[in-house]
Amino acid sequence: MRKKVGIIGGGASGMMAAVTAAGAADVTILEHTARIGKKILSTGNGKCNYTNRTLSKDDYYCDHPSFVAHALSQFDDQAASAFFAAHGMLTSEKRDGYCYPYTGQAATVLNVLRMLLEEKGVTVKTEQKIEGVTAGKDGFIVKTRTDRYRFDKLILACGGNAAPQTGSDGSGYALAKSLGHTLRRPYPALTYLLTKDPACKELAGVRANALLTLYVDGEKVQMEEGELQLNKDSLSGIPVFQLSHRAVQALAAKKKTTISVDFLPQLGEEELLHMLTELQKQYRKQPVEEVLALFLNKKICGALLHRLSLPFQQEMQTVSDKQLKKLAKLCRHFVFEMSGYPGFDKAQVTMGGVPVSEIDDTMQSGKVRNLYFAGEIIDVDGRCGGYNLQWAWTSGYIAGLHCCDQENVSENRETERESR
């Protein structure tokens, strides 16, 4: 007799779990919004960066990296690309290993999954607000505002708190807790960072390639290079997103959090000083601002001069050697103190969730038999660049595969958790 598998959450991980399980079970997705897969449509600026060719466990934040490594060994970036290619989606690979549908439209990825669900006979129930889940010897009872369902196996793929406008409202956390699981406090990740530094106001609108270094209580923590976007009260752009996990953790813990910006990462400090010295000889009578603008955005020039209290129109020949050294140093170490971070509505993913120490390598709960987890509800979050969607595919595939096994409880589950 075919088992009944219920999946709470119709996002990327829930749909992958459903497609995987559908061949061996009767699968029902319960989605609390009016449509499935809404968050997929906003990924990659609407282009859906669905995985990354540089994939490794080091691209994820997780208390037990071996958990992620084992999961990726079962379904990695090549498996994800092969899956979509096998179902008709042409793909393209961009810089840094970013992979997209060839159409450049996130809807293509969603349509593959949506059509597969229909072809495989998966029942999709939308607008199902979950009111409670009860686990018993005979399976699970899921109560919604309008219906009552019984399942032999249950997969929680409810997502996190990030981007609540797409349906990710954190409701799955309460369900996990009601079934005996603990929770790592959720925080926004892959987000911009706030600052009260007045320099941001004059730098608003600037985009510049830069090397960013995150310091927490004076200790260097992480470095990222890419296009920095400066706004009137925040730093943004991919390098900031990459720093945001550790920065948000530090800010939440009330630690001093600063980001040092190198506006000329292609030059060493001595090389830059030599260049400034030569330019001083060449343009003796020219305003220092105009000379700096030969290689820096003019707004950046203004911020540098303001911070050093140098007049914009001061002639280069009157700038002292000491001032030139300070200018060279500031170009490569322009420090912003961060004051906070925005809410979940401005974040791409959630850090925190159900600890992996409570989940085995089949994505099954270590507390409740036949309960599985997939996606962002698990305390695993990745870097920007397709890694979080890959985690959705990976964890969804593993949960969907193993929830259909006749004997799906690992006898070594306790050993697995203790070894991580």
Feature annotation, model-predicted:
Residues 126-139:
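A conserved short coil-to-beta-strand element within the FAD-binding core of flavoproteins
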Residues 6-8, 130, 149-165, 176, ...:
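Short hydrophobic core segments
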Residues 125-126, 301-381:
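A glycine-rich dinucleotide-binding beta-alpha-beta segment and adjacent secondary-structure elements
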Residues 153-199:
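Glycine-rich loop(s) and the adjacent beta-strand/alpha-helix scaffold that form part
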Residues 22-45:
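Glycine-rich FAD pyrophosphate-binding loop
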Residues 34-36, 41-42, 50-57, 182-185, ...:
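An anion/pyrophosphate-binding glycine-rich loop and adjacent beta-alpha core
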Residues 3-29, 399-404:
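N-terminal Rossmann-like FAD-binding beta1-loop-alpha1 element of flavoenzymes
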